[in-house]
Amino acid sequence: MKFFFIFFIFLFSFLIQSCYSDNTILRSQSLKDGDVIYSEGKRFAFGFFSLGNSKLRYVGIWYAQVSEQTIVWVANRDHPINDTSGLIKFSTRGNLCVYASGNGTEPIWSTDVIDMIQEPALVAKLSDLGNLVLLDPVTGKSFWESFNHPTNTLLPFMKFGFTRQSGVDRIMTSWRSPGDPGSGNITYRIERRGFPQMMMYKGLTLWWRTGSWTGQRWSGVPEMTNKFIFNISFVNNPDEVSITYGVLDASVTTRMVLNETGTLQRFRWNGRDKKWIGFWSAPEDKCDIYNHCGFNGYCDSTSTEKFECSCLPGYEPKTPRDWFLRDASDGCTRIKADSICNGKEGFAKLKRVKIPNTSAVNVDMNITLKECEQRCLKNCSCVAYASAYHESQDGAKGCLTWHGNMLDTRTYLSSGQDFYLRVDKSELARWNGNGASGKKRLVLILISLIAVVMLLLISFHCYLRKRRQRTQSNRLRKAPSSFAPSSFDLEDSFILEELEDKSRSRELPLFELSTIATATNNFAFQNKLGAGGFGPVYKGVLQNGMEIAVKRLSKSSGQGMEEFKNEVKLISKLQHRNLVRILGCCVEFEEKMLVYEYLPNKSLDYFIFHEEQRAELDWPKRMGIIRGIGRGILYLHQDSRLRIIHRDLKASNVLLDNEMIPKIADFGLARIFGGNQIEGSTNRVVGTYGYMSPEYAMDGQFSIKSDVYSFGVLILEIITGKRNSAFYEESLNLVKHIWDRWENGEAIEIIDKLMGEETYDEGEVMKCLHIGLLCVQENSSDRPDMSSVVFMLGHNAIDLPSPKHPAFTAGRRRNTKTGGSSDNWPSGETSSTINDVTLTDVQGR
């Protein structure tokens, strides 16, 4: 019996010493390497860890519910332990310490607070916020906490800044490298001097600053908001200057990291994809780099000029030669003027500005902006002023005045604040439009001009309305009875006018409805070539014997009107051998139609997805089709008068003439870009599953690389004779199937055998397959542009880069036996098809 009692006491003591499933370390306990304590909700863990393949051991805090190792705080960051003999325990004086071994007497890290021998109940507790706290569990009094000693990570509800009375200054310091948490040379802190702002340093060099606090946000962080994710609390009083970011939704896991390259980044954890997603970073551009344009200069990243730097009003380049060479580091100096401080100067108002460095400003929070102006005007050394809190809940308040050089000023398209710069009377006249009276005259002139223009527009509108009524009346009399209108949309009349203008300029012929009806035998069923979400397509024969294809907008189509207008605008301007040729259009009553050249061989999908027709396409024909499609896309992206992204490239939108020359068709979803624009975004994602690039399907981001992705899918379909949207063996789609075979060195096995092995060179086919995989890489920046693709297709003696992991965009489940498709769409999406066109309305998240 005595033996069992002793054994029970021993076991109980062992459990007390070794079991750390709770969130607390008692003063009598220790934590050895391998032991971990968790916060109450199991969100965070505290213990020993290593990074990557390193054997060095550190003590720190990390996310417990995140699959990717993410360290948020490191105790012994500059003193790692070489093996697993480390120990965490309380010292005799009550500090929590880390020892390199269980026998060590001198700690390598300590909380290093006041002597706490008189605190026998002291514990270390890990909270669900990720904060390790030394406290008295009875009174709740805190003696030390890790939140007051951040490393490279700022967590929600972590107070950041300084407290004068306690001497606590919370400073973030980067790691040395991703695999070394030692103290790096990048620091981030709240500036103690002048008016509060956040500063990032590279060593001793100021690298970036947030701008001053406006009452709602930092003036140099226009993306900052407290409405959706964060509840931001800013404190500025004689004892404390701090900021705290609280999350409004506890389910959102987010952190801000200062990395070793000098970038501050904010991440959120994507539980679905199991990875961190970055959604903000700074510095963002050249204008964010501290004092990029020198003293008294300002930076405008949206400037249409070649140089983003300019001098503030009333200033000129200090070294004109350097400015000509695009070097503004010497800054600007005031233009010599006689009227400064003689009562004849004033203030130029600069809007949407990140105001200059506030480290040396004079601050008075008890006067209005108008009083601030008068104070600055009376002080000859005052060069500028601004409101301290211009976005305060109580309205603009406080006064900031600058005396001397102004550093690190920039402008924004939106956000920023007003900044008032002292200038002499001549500069003020130029800035304000020849003075106040000149400004009033300018306003009167503008009002008069607007009134005249409005009168002309109203008169012109009345004229057009009468002309439309006459045109409508004439056409009603001529219309066949089978097309009598039930209504006439005002929008249709505007389209008709635009098309009539194109017809008169011979840019796009306009067909009469009666002509189209006769050519198609009143849209007889036997002349119907196909149908889609836009509406049916009919074959017709004009009186001169020319065969045509008529695309007729269905009255029930919910998507067709916008696509119809888009296609009319685009295709009438495009001319290329590999683009379908439009012959004209027709808009009468409720009828809207496009008239194309007739292509007897139908579309590409008719050949490559049907066994009998596929056998007609040997390798030379398939290679010719691939190259032709590539040249057509290159023309859209680069060589046409407009830069166009098709957005719906697929096999059914490639038509074949009698010589099997491919013609890209269906420009209803295309987008026109400016000459230098290469990407855009939309909330209305349209296209076809299986052909849509991942960044477009998931985020609405489209670019020339979106078409490259679709072209890559086409290449793979042409080579294999299989649809991308079908399931193959265990693969999600064709791209995944090909990638698996490519990785295993079995890609040659998926080439379509119906081509006939004698018609193709294995090396050439594999090169095309290689190019197809380069086009469907997941990251759009990794994909080649179309000029590179066309070059690679036309040259054999070149080395191709190895393709990276492709994107596997989910498509509809197909019946691989029949080639048909089921209705297994992702839930919550609505779709309609023009030969499988898919439209998805993406709601903001």
Curated annotation (Swiss-Prot):
Cysteine pairs forming cystine bridges in this chain are 287-299, 293-309, 372-399, 376-382
Which residues does the UniProt record annotate as the domain Bulb-type lectin?
Answer: 22-147
The protein's topology relative to the membrane is: Single-pass type I membrane protein
Q: Residues in the active site?
A: 648 (proton acceptor)
UniProt keyword Nucleotidyltransferase present:
no
UniProt keyword terms in alphabetical order:
ATP-binding, Cell membrane, Disulfide bond, EGF-like domain, Glycoprotein, Kinase, Lectin, Membrane, Nucleotide-binding, Receptor, Serine/threonine-protein kinase, Signal, Transferase, Transmembrane, Transmembrane helix
Q: Which domain of life is it from?
A: Eukaryota
For the region CaM-binding, give the residue spans.
Answer: 612-629
Which subcellular locations apply to this protein? Cell membrane
User: Where is each PAN domain found?
Assistant: 341-424
Chief localisation class: membrane
Where composition is biased (Polar residues), the residues are 817-845
**Bilayer-crossing regions:** 442-462
The residues listed in the UniProt record as binding ATP, with positions renumbered to this chain, are 529-537, 551
- Record GO biological process: recognition of pollen
Glycosylated residues in this chain: 82, 103, 185, 231, 259, 357, 366, 379
Kindly list the GO molecular function terms attached to this UniProt entry: ATP binding; calmodulin binding; carbohydrate binding; protein serine kinase activity; protein serine/threonine kinase activity; ubiquitin protein ligase binding
Q: Which residues lie on this side of the membrane: Cytoplasmic?
A: 463-845
Q: What is its EC number?
A: 2.7.11.1
The entry sums up its family as follows: Belongs to the protein kinase superfamily. Ser/Thr protein kinase family.
Protein name, per record? G-type lectin S-receptor-like serine/threonine-protein kinase At1g11410
Supply the source organism for this entry.
Arabidopsis thaliana (Mouse-ear cress)
